[in-house]
């Protein structure tokens, strides 16, 4: 089995590594975390411009059609930099569920908005119970 990165994966790794190196030194990260938002909108916009928000999504919705290995590359570098922008909840969790289980209407309306950086999402799970306030 060959575990070497493809040429595209090497480019992705280099791009994300450069972003983290240039934008996430320890002091900068601490200032981001201490901010009112707890993350930086400018970084989120840059993720969109770099195509990082579209890595796992199908090309039919404007994504890059990446595989799990491509997401692993992004997440590994984000982990090294302790990146705090909501990539995991938006792109992987909520976006992943919409991608796998959403209707075509949901996919066509929500996924491009995630990829463009216009919206952020989170996963909400609830189960019916007498205390369920969402019923």
Give the positions of each predicted feature.
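N-terminal glycine-rich flavin-associated loop
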Residues: 83-105, 131
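Generic helix-packing signal
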Residues: 13, 20, 98-99, 130
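Amphipathic, small/basic residue-rich leader segments at the start of a protein or domain
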Residues: 1-88, 109, 113
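Single conserved hydrophobic/aromatic residue that forms the stacking wall/gate
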Residues: 125-135
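A short, Trp-centered hydrophobic/proline-enriched beta-strand micro-motif
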Residues: 117-124
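A short linear-motif detector with a strong N-terminal bias
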Residues: 32-34, 76-78, 99-103, 118, ...
